[in-house]
Regions:
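Short coil turns that delineate tetratricopeptide repeat
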Residues: 73, 107, 111, 145, ...
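Start-of-helix register in tetratricopeptide repeats
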Residues: 43, 77, 111-115, 149, ...
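Residue at a conserved register position within TPR or TPR-like alpha-solenoid repeats
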Residues: 52, 86, 124, 158, ...
Length: 411
C-alpha cells in the first residue's frame, strides 16, 4: 500500500510539473499580470505580417505587424521587428526610437537586452553614427561575449575605418566562437593580416610587412595578394630570387589568380638574364589548363615584345575561343594586326572566331551581391565581403571552338 501511494505521489508530481511547464511556456508575468504568449501569434495580423516580410513587402509587413502589436503593446519581438523594418526603409530615427524605448523596460532578460542593443547598433551603423554603433556592439558583447552578429558587425566597422589590427582581433574572436566550423574564418584572417602588412609597407617598414604577409599565407595559403606583396617587399630589399619564389608560389597555390604575377615574373626573369623561363612558365600553365586564356595572352605579349608578332598572333587566336568576350584579347589582336600590316588572311581568321562575340568592360562580378567591376577586387566595395569576385565568362563549347580553329587553319 505504501509503495502504491509513493508511486501515485511521484506520478502526481510529474503531472503537476508538466502543467506548470506548459503554463510557463504559454504565459509570462509582466507588470503583475499574466500575458498569453500564444494570443499574439494567433492574430491574423501577425501571420500576415510575417508572410509579407518573407515576400520582402516591407510596407505591408509594417502595417500588419503594427496592427498585431496594438493587441499587445508588450510584445517585445514584434516591436524589435518593426524597428528593424523602419531601419530597412531608411527611417533610422524612428528605428532608434523604437529600440531605445524597448531598452527602458525593466524586465528584459539579459538575452533580450543584448539583442535589442544589437538592433540599436545596426540602426546607428545604418545611419552613419559610427561611435554610437561601436559603443552599442561593445555593450552587446559585455552581456553576451559570444554574440557572433555583434562581433561580425564590429569587425566590419573596424574594416570600414581601416583599423585592421582591431578588425583582426575581433575576427579571431569570431573564429573561436565558430570553432573551425566555418572555413571562411581563415580566409578573412589571411586577408586582414595582408592589410596589416600593406600598412607596414606604406610606412616603409619592410621587415614588419614581410612578417605580416608571411603570416597571412600561413593562416590561409590562398591569400593571393599576400604572395604578390611579399614578393614586392623582397624585391625592394634586393632579394630578387626570394621575390620570384613568392610569386611562383602564388601560381602554385592559387592558379586562378596566378596571372597577377605574370608581369612581375617576366620582368624578374629578364633581370636575371633568363627570359626563356617566362616562356616555359606560360607553356606549363597552358598544358595544365587547356582552357586558360590568360597564359596564352601573356605569352603572346611576351613574344610581341621580342618581335615575334606572327607567333604572338597565333597564341591570341588560341586564347580567343576560351574567352571570346574579353576585350583585352581583341585589343591585343588589333595591335598585332596593325604591326603585321592588316594582312587579309589574318583578318579573316580573326573574324571567323569573333562573329558572335560580345565585348564588355566589367567581367568581374561579386558572388554575394552581384556588384560588377572591371578588375578583380579582393574586397567588394558594396557588400564588403572578402574574396568574392569571380570572372564572369560566356565561353562557347569546346566542339564549336575546335571547329572554328580548324576552319581558320584551312583558311
Amino acid at each position: 500500500m505504501t509503495t502504491q501511494l509513493y508511486l501515485l505521489a511521484v506520478l502526481f508530481a510529474l503531472l503537476l510539473g508538466l502543467m506548470v511547464g506548459k503554463a510557463w511556456e504559454r504565459y509570462k508575468l509582466r507588470d503583475g499580470r499574466w500575458i498569453d504568449r500564444r494570443r499574439l501569434r494567433e492574430t491574423p495580423h501577425y501571420m500576415l505580417g510575417l508572410n509579407f516580410l518573407v515576400d520582402s513587402q516591407v510596407d505591408q509587413a509594417i502595417e500588419e505587424l503594427t496592427q498585431a502589436a496594438s493587441t499587445d503593446t508588450d510584445a517585445l519581438e514584434i516591436q524589435m521587428i518593426l524597428g528593424n523594418l523602419y531601419r530597412e526603409k531608411g527611417q533610422v530615427g524612428r528605428a532608434v526610437n523604437v529600440h531605445q524605448q524597448l531598452l527602458q523596460r525593466p524586465d528584459l532578460t539579459t538575452l533580450e537586452h543584448a539583442y535589442v542593443l544589437l538592433c540599436l547598433g545596426l540602426d546607428f551603423r545604418h545611419g552613419g553614427f559610427v561611435d554610437r554603433a561601436l559603443e552599442a556592439f561593445q555593450e552587446v558583447l559585455v552581456l553576451d561575449p559570444r554574440n557572433r552578429y555583434a562581433l561580425i558587425n564590429l569587425q566590419k566597422m573596424y574594416e570600414d575605418q581601416h583599423q585592421w589590427s582591431d578588425a583582426l582581433r575581433v575576427r579571431e574572436q569570431v573564429a573561436k566562437v565558430d570553432a573551425g566550423r566555418r572555413p571562411e574564418d581563415q580566409q578573412i584572417l589571411g586577408f586582414l593580416r595582408n592589410e596589416i602588412g600593406s600598412v607596414h609597407q606604406r610606412a616603409g617598414d619592410g621587415a614588419a610587412a614581410a612578417r605580416a604577409f608571411a603570416e597571412a599565407i600561413d593562416v590561409d595559403a590562398r591569400t593571393a595578394p599576400a604572395y604578390l606583396n611579399l614578393g614586392d617587399v623582397r624585391e625592394r630589399q634586393g632579394d630578387l630570387s626570394g621575390a620570384i619564389e613568392a610569386w611562383e608560389r602564388l601560381i602554385e597555390a592559387v592558379p586562378e589568380h596566378g596571372y597577377f604575377a605574370f608581369d612581375r615574373l617576366e620582368r624578374a626573369y629578364r633581370m636575371l638574364g633568363a627570359p626563356h623561363r617566362f616562356v616555359g612558365l606560360c607553356e606549363r600553365l597552358i598544358s595544365g589548363d587547356p582552357q586558360g586564356w590568360r597564359p596564352r595572352l601573356a605569352l603572346s605579349r611576351h613574344l610581341s615584345a621580342a618581335g615575334q608578332h606572327r607567333a604572338a598572333f597565333d597564341w591570341l587566336l588560341e586564347a580567343l575561343p576560351h574567352h571570346p568576350h574579353g576585350l583585352a584579347i581583341h585589343q591585343e589582336i588589333w595591335e598585332t594586326l596593325s604591326v603585321l600590316g592588316f594582312e587579309p588572311g589574318l583578318i579573316r581568321r580573326y573574324v571567323e572566331l569573333t562573329r558572335e562575340a560580345v565585348f564588355y568592360l566589367d567581367p568581374h562580378v561579386c558572388r554575394r551581391c552581384r556588384y560588377r567591376s572591371a578588375e578583380l577586387l579582393w574586397q567588394c566595395p558594396q557588400c564588403h565581403e572578402w574574396n568574392t569576385f569571380v570572372e564572369e565568362r560566356t565561353a562557347r563549347s569546346k566542339e564549336v571552338a575546335a571547329e572554328e580553329i580548324g576552319l581558320a587553319g584551312r583558311g
